[in-house]
Amino acid sequence: MKSLFYLKLLLWVVLLSLCLLMAHRKTKVADKFRALRSRIQLRFNRHIRLNDSFADDLENGLHSRNFDIISENSNDVRGGLDDVSKNEIKQIMENDNVDFDKARLLYMERKFGQNGIAPDGTPIDPKAFTFDSR
């Protein structure tokens, strides 16, 4: 009788721990389930509606939770990233060992720098005049 009580108590502790863990990592778990669902759909030849240029990006890992290309984008006429940008972002991901979001940010900051713009979006040119929002 006493061992049954401890078994039930252990079960509740494990269940509560799992619930707390799921609440803490809900976005990561949701992303994993979304990716798993996509893989299952692809495995059973279920069609995922993607713009053709986004399909290649998905296969190459050029997506994230913040840059979701799996969601409804079949009517999106934009072409996504050009091939040169994709290759540069992939190189940043591999060389700096960062995820897609960070690589995209680094790529944009470098492009800003090449065009005379600071990483925060303000012009580097000392002659430039900006209005303060105070």
UniProtKB/Swiss-Prot annotation:
InterPro entries per record: DUF2015
Domain of life: Eukaryota
Keywords of the record: Isopeptide bond, Phosphoprotein, Signal, Ubl conjugation
Family named by the database record: Belongs to the UPF0357 family.
Residues annotated with Phosphoserine modification: S71, S74
Protein name: UPF0357 protein YCL012C
PANTHER family attached to this UniProt entry: UPF0357 PROTEIN YCL012C (PTHR28023:SF1)
Cross-link (Glycyl lysine isopeptide (Lys-Gly) (interchain with G-Cter in ubiquitin)): K86
Position of the signal peptide: 1-23
Organism the protein comes from: Saccharomyces cerevisiae (strain ATCC 204508 / S288c)
